[in-house]
């Protein structure tokens, strides 16, 4: 059988050229063994591994196996010892019939890497069959006038053995009239002829009975016998003669049954019964031949279907016998013409599935193709779909390997359905399709991928510990353990961030939990990295950034910085009675540790000794006079201010202000008692006279001292002349300024300076006495200079 290698634009086709039939892989020359037929099963034919130069252990490691055409297991390979064993008893006549020599072809297939070795096993014939005649008796009718030397053909004996074990000679029982001559046919077979030695006499002996013996050439020889019954007839002068001694015809193998093959014709010059001719197949071929002859017309017709692959030609001998017993013969040589009636056959030797996705040039399958037809009818094309990443490669005779053409990607396609098509070149073309499914196994070639490169989580402060604050998620395109993701917290880049005490992550699902209650005022935001690692080998990982923003809760009440409410000697604001409406009495300064609207403060005058005398601005905390002051107004006033934030619910604080109405600033005024009377005391003329006298007496001296104090205050803030008494001890921690720019963690100094020319004081927030470590921006001065009119502190 021939194959050719071809390729079309539509398909990647692979066809063996005739020369490829003789190409073998390196080191794979044919090894031939010979054993007699009927050898018992289990017989060790040879050590195949040794003959091929292979190590015994190599057979097992490379997956050695025997391949047989038709998948009939006749031989068995012991991969441990390398011995080739007979799997069953072999009968040459059953396996090969009359074909000589009888050779069985096997292939030794080695995987990883793929390699083929051709092995041939020849079965030699033994003399296990005796010759057999098709009939127990042959009848010959011979006229008594037949001349000595006349030859009479006899039917041959059948012997299924071949060569010297087939029929070699014929003998006849001793007699005085005949002997047997043995001749060779064109196909090497022997056939007998009966030769008349002495004329017959019907009156003396009308019938003879002889024994014909067929002997084969075996040792010892086997024989078979039949009886020849000869009937002596009256004179018959002429024997039938065929028009041709040899008829040559061609018969297509797909000819229908009973179709006419050829017509033979013989004539006899005698008249009457002696001139009547009857035709018959000769030499016992009636049983084995697929033909039948009409004894009257000589038409040879087909009685069984022909098969070129089984028997490509026939030699049929025809005998014509007249009524007197004389006969003639001719030979019909029939050549069976091959037609494309056999589709190609595909035998899968090995199939590897699944295959790893990262291994190009991987052998997926090894298979063989065959077509019993001849010529173009047996020439084949093998192909697969052209859109697949696979390639067909011819290897050994009639063998192909299916290999991966490039690296596969299981994530893109996890399996391939491949159709292997084998088409012959006959007319019409016949084809065979074989479908295989190749699964692609996963390799850990994809790292986990987070759904987002960064995550922003919002957590309201004062949360409960172990609260789930969010989750991260990563997917892996691989499968199995290669796709199982484990989450973890990566070491923080900020060495001062104690991440392990803040959050934790569930390694299985990526849920994030806050380990403790968060305080916005202490930590407003932080970020960290999370990792996702698969369980492949080697493991692959990726990371994502997580930002946690702490949302402020209204958990801090406003804190009044000025005036201080815990001082043993609270400040008193002096207001001249000549002050105009809108005169700035003082400014309440408060802060809120929260942020946003939780730190938006509003001010409200909650209580006053004399309602309507003072007013307060809601947004800046300024206390101003609401009207002109009169002599009837009490000198001492106590104001209660409410400071409230804008949180939900709102929080508040109160501050108490002491205001003293004076006519001038001629002398310092002692601090007022902590509690001012709720109602104004009655004016006393005596008090006014004393105050006026004291004021006039000390006006000049006081003015000079005030001027000097203002100058010194402006030059050096470290030693102000006028200063409110600030009790020792720090303020409450974690104070945030109104703008929410930072946290106040240390005590601050406050300073009230009074200028003589302007009549206005300056209220300043100074830098902390002890440097503190605050977040960026928190180290700035919390308060900017705020003007306070007529504010004066008494020591």
Swiss-Prot record:
Residues 1-30 form the signal peptide. The keyword Transferase does not apply. Residues 35-133, 138-242, 247-346, 351-450, 455-560, 567-670 form the Cadherin domain. Residues 31-689 are extracellular. The chain crosses the membrane at residues 690-710. GO terms for biological process: cell adhesion; homophilic cell adhesion via plasma membrane adhesion molecules; nervous system development. GO terms for molecular function: calcium ion binding. It is a single-pass type I membrane protein. Keywords: Acetylation, Calcium, Cell adhesion, Cell membrane, Glycoprotein, Membrane, Repeat, Signal, Transmembrane, Transmembrane helix. Residues 711-795 are cytoplasmic. Glycans are attached at residues 169, 417, 435, 566. The modification N6-acetyllysine is found at residue 296. GO terms for cellular component: plasma membrane. It holds the Pfam family Cadherin_C_2. It is found in: Cell membrane. PANTHER family: CADHERIN-87A (PTHR24028), PROTOCADHERIN BETA-5 (PTHR24028:SF90). Potential calcium-dependent cell-adhesion protein. May be involved in the establishment and maintenance of specific neuronal connections in the brain. This is Protocadherin beta-5. It comes from Pan troglodytes (Chimpanzee).
């Amino acid at each position: 059988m021939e194959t050719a290698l071809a390729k079309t634009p539509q398909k990647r086709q692979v066809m063996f050229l005739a020369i490829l039939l003789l190409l073998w892989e390196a080191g794979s020359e044919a090894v031939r063994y010979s054993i007699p037929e009927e050898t018992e099963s289990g017989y060790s034919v040879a050590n195949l591994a040794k003959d091929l130069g292979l190590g015994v252990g190599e057979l097992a490691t490379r997956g050695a196996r025997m391949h047989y055409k038709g998948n009939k297991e006749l031989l068995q390979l012991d991969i441990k010892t390398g011995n080739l064993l007979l799997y069953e008893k072999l009968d040459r006549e059953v396996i090969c019939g009359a074909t000589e020599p009888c050779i069985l072809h096997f292939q030794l297939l080695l995987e990883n890497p793929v390699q083929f070795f051709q092995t041939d096993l020849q079965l030699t014939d033994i003399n296990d069959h005796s010759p057999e005649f098709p009939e127990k008796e042959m009848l010959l009718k011979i006229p008594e006038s037949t001349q000595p030397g006349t030859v009479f053909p006899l039917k041959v004996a059948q012997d299924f053995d071949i060569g010297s074990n087939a029929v070699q000679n014929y003998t006849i029982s001793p007699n005085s009239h005949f002997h047997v001559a043995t001749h060779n046919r064109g196909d090497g077979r022997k056939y007998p002829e009966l030769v008349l030695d002495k004329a017959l006499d019907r009156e003396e002996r009308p019938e003879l009975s002889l024994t014909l013996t067929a002997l084969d050439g075996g040792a010892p020889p086997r024989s078979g016998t039949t009886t020849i019954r000869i009937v002596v007839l009256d004179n018959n002068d002429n024997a039938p003669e065929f028009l041709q001694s040899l008829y040559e015809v061609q018969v297509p193998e797909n000819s229908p049954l009973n179709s006419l093959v050829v017509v033979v014709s013989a004539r006899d010059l005698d008249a009457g019964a002696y001139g009547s001719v009857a035709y018959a197949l000769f030499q016992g071929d009636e049983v084995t031949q697929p033909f039948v002859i009409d004894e009257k017309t000589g038409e040879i017709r087909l009685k069984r279907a022909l098969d070129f692959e089984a028997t490509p030609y026939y030699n049929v001998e025809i005998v014509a016998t007249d009524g007197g017993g004389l006969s003639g013969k001719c030979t019909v040589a029939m050549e069976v013409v091959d037609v494309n009636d056999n589709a190609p056959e595909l035998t899968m030797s090995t199939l590897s599935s699944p295959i790893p996705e990262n291994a190009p040039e991987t052998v997926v399958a090894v298979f063989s193709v065959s077509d019993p037809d001849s010529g173009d009818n047996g020439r084949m094309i093998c192909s697969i779909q052209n859109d697949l990443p696979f390639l067909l490669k011819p290897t050994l005779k009639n063998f192909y390997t299916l290999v991966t053409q490039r690296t596969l990607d299981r994530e893109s396609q996890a399996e391939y359905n491949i159709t292997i098509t084998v088409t012959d070149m006959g007319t019409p073309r016949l084809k065979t399709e074989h479908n295989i499914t190749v699964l692609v196994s996963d390799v850990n070639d994809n790292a986990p991928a987070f759904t987002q490169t960064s995550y922003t989580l919002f957590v309201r402060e004062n949360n409960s510990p172990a609260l789930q604050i969010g989750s991260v998620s990563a997917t892996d395109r691989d499968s199995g353990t290669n796709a199982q993701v484990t989450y973890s917290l990566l070491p923080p880049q900020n060495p001062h961030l104690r991440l392990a005490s803040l959050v934790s992550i569930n390694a299985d699902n990526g849920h994030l939990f806050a380990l403790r209650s968060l305080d916005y005022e202490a930590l407003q935001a932080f970020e960290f990295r999370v990792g996702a690692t698969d369980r492949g080998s080697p493991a692959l990982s990726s990371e994502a950034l997580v930002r946690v923003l702490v949302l402020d809760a209204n958990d801090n009440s406003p804190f009044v910085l000025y005036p201080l409410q815990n001082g043993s000697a609270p400040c008193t604001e002096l207001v001249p009675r000549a002050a105009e409406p809108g005169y700035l009495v003082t400014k309440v300064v408060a802060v809120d540790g929260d942020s946003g609207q939780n730190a938006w403060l509003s001010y409200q005058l909650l209580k006053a000794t004399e309602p309507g005398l003072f007013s307060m601005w809601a947004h800046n905390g300024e206390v101003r006079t609401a009207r002109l002051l009169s002599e009837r107004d009490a000198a001492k006033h106590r104001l209660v201010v409410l400071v409230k934030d804008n949180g939900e619910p709102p929080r508040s604080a109160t501050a108490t202000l002491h205001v003293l109405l004076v006519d001038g600033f001629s002398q310092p005024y002692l601090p007022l008692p902590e509690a001012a009377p709720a109602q104004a005391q009655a004016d006393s003329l005596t008090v006014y006279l004393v105050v006026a006298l004291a004021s006039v007496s000390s006006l000049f001296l006081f003015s000079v001292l005030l001027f000097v104090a203002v100058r010194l205050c402006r030059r050096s803030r470290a030693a102000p002349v006028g200063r409110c008494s600030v009790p020792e001890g720090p303020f409450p921690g974690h104070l945030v300024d109104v703008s929410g720019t930072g946290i106040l963690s240390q005590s601050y100094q406050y300073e009230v300076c009074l200028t003589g020319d302007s009549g206005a004081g300056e209220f300043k927030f100074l830098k902390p006495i002890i440097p503190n470590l605050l977040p960026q921006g928190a180290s700035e001065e919390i308060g900017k200079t705020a003007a306070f009119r007529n504010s004066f502190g008494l020591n």
